[in-house]
Amino acid sequence: MSEAAHSGAAPADLVELGRIASAYGVKGWVKVQPHSAQAEVLRTVSHWWLTRPAPQAARDVVASVPRAYQVLQARVHGGAVVAQLAGIDDRDQAEALRGCFVQAARSAFPAPADDEYYWVDLIGCALYSDADGEPRLLGVVDEVFDNGAHAVLKVLRQQIQPGQPGPVPLLDPKGRPLEELVPFVRAHIRHVDLAARRIDSDWPLDY
């Protein structure tokens, strides 16, 4: 293991941002495939925490617990991010990191611009719609992804029912959660209140 990596206590707010796809060049750089279009975080944080998938952990290049690597340089390369990590000096060392998940502490993210949000912060928010004139719960955000044009919220449908202590999941006839895909665009999103974990929209409830 390189002395540049350390396995001290990992931050409690680690967020998975991508996965190392391969080595890049012959000087120890790695190529990362980001999980989202918000790859700028990979370029701006000072440390990545790498975790090897369980089936590969026996190789002991990176333990199954996160290990921190200092990011010396990072830049966008096509749809990927390439980076130089401290202590990774040749292609063999870089190839040994192939498959590792790349995480960073949420507290280390740069502040987003006005009216911009990190996708990880939207997950778990309740989505409401006032398409019928009054705010009604549509569901809870389970995932955010990019469809090539804009971000999309995958919402697990929920409903407030009398006598129930909280929202009740809506299921299809086979007992599977009902899902709704809602574009995260100004045309439909009216307000985001991260402190209240609430997003207001005008998305039709029966779209």
Swiss-Prot record:
InterPro entries per the UniProt record, alphabetical: PRC_barrel-like_sf (IPR011033), PRC_RimM (IPR056792), RimM (IPR011961), RimM_N (IPR002676), RimM_N_sf (IPR036976), Transl_B-barrel_sf (IPR009000)
Domain of life the protein comes from: Bacteria
Principal place of residence: cytoplasm
Keyword field: Chaperone, Cytoplasm, Ribosome biogenesis, rRNA processing
Compartments in which it is found: Cytoplasm
Keyword Kinase applies: no
The PRC barrel domain, residue ranges: 114-207
A Gene Ontology biological process term: ribosomal small subunit biogenesis
Pfam families for this protein: PRC_RimM (PF24986), RimM (PF01782)
Single GO cellular component term: ribosome
Molecular function per GO: ribosome binding
Record note on quaternary structure: Binds ribosomal protein uS19.
NCBIfam families: 16S_RimM
Domain remarks in the Swiss-Prot or TrEMBL record: The PRC barrel domain binds ribosomal protein uS19.
Family: Belongs to the RimM family.
Function: An accessory protein needed during the final step in the assembly of 30S ribosomal subunit, possibly for assembly of the head region. Essential for efficient processing of 16S rRNA. May be needed both before and after RbfA during the maturation of 16S rRNA. It has affinity for free ribosomal 30S subunits but not for 70S ribosomes.
Name of the molecule in the record: Ribosome maturation factor RimM
UniProt gene name: rimM
